[in-house]
């Protein structure tokens, strides 16, 4: 049985450690069996540390410019005591405000030769990374008092029609206090008497406590999990360390990948997207089209069909998943 990780925080239940999948690399059938059983793969020390270091360096450069970390450290983000009331790395999807989102270091990272080669081996194909990246620099002491789980949810309800895998990686050491990410093992599969999984998140107390898994993370580790796997970030209870991580979403490039571009035309029946290659692609929209926009607490919630032409604007950067010409999913690039 996996070791238990315990916490001095009374709101944090003991959790078993994630199963490590390194021994499955190179065995496609074994990887698929583990995925079907658990809903995730966890790998230790598989991502090139130099590439991870360069990615972390972008985070640290941004945070030094903000004046909130010890400028002498290049291995971690250590709070220097500066006020954090207006700390802008909030990952809330608001355009033009998050300085890490403006830098968008994911693109350089996934083209690093060793990183690209590893993910192609893992996916068994060249990888299509959707323009949806989460950059986390969670301040020390962040989170609600008495609640360690930041937001219980699955990504599937908010990503209709996209067969994505979520790839989460720590960029600096994450110990028990700093938190990291926890997930519920084996609860990705359809089952009778399941708990509701609405787009706005999963209710407290419905996930069996013995399903939760976590780890103490190091740079080079990688956690890949299903869109249907319940998970949550854990509140950062450290006194001084920011929690640095990035999660990206990908699928085999040979699959039915979404169209990425800007909105060129839109009405109550269809949307046209202009791609960087100069193409214009038009898709029907209907009552089943899941379209989301950035709108505060309702970010991630689907728009009604009549709201789509009102709230999506010409020129908006989006990506669109489609099935036989009908858009199943529309969302802003992020």
Predicted segments — roles?
Residues 2-21, 65-73, 197, 222-224, ...:
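Non-heme Fe(II)/2-oxoglutarate
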Residues 174-232:
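Double-stranded beta-helix
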């Amino acid at each position: 049985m996996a070791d238990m990780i315990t916490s001095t925080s009374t709101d944090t239940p003991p959790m078993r450690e994630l199963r490590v999948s390194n021994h499955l690399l190179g065995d496609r059938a074994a990887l698929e069996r583990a995925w079907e059983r658990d809903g995730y793969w966890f790998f230790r020390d598989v991502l090139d540390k130099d590439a991870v270091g360069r990615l972390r360096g972008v985070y640290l450069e941004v945070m030094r410019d903000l004046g909130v970390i010890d400028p002498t450290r290049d291995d971690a983000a250590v709070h220097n005591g500066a006020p954090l009331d207006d700390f802008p790395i909030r990952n809330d999807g608001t355009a033009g405000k998050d300085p890490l989102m403006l830098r968008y270091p994911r693109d350089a990272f996934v083209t690093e030769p060793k990183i690209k080669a590893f993910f192609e081996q893992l996916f068994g194909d060249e990888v299509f990374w959707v323009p949806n990246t989460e950059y986390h620099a969670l301040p020390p002491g962040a989170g609600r008092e008495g609640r360690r789980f930041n937001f219980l949810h699955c990504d599937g309800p908010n990503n209709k029609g996209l067969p994505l895998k979520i790839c989460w990686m720590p960029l600096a050491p994450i110990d028990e206090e700093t938190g990291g990410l926890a997930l519920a093992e084996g609860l990705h599969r359809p089952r009778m008497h399941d708990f509701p999984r609405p787009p706005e998140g999963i209710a407290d107390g419905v996930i069996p406590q013995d399903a939760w898994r976590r780890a103490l993370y190091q740079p080079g580790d990688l956690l890949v999990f299903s869109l249907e796997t319940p998970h949550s970030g854990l509140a950062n209870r450290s006194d001084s360390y920011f929690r640095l991580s990035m999660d990206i979403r990908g699928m085999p490039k040979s699959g039915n990948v979404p169209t990425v571009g800007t909105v060129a035309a839109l009405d109550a029946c269809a949307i046209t997207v202009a791609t960087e290659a100069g193409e214009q692609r038009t898709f029907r929209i209907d009552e089943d089209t899941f379209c989301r926009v950035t709108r505060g607490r309702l970010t991630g919630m689907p728009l009604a069909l009549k709201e789509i032409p009102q709230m999506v604007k010409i020129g908006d950067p989006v990506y669109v998943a489609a099935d036989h010409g009908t858009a199943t999913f529309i969302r802003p690039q992020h």
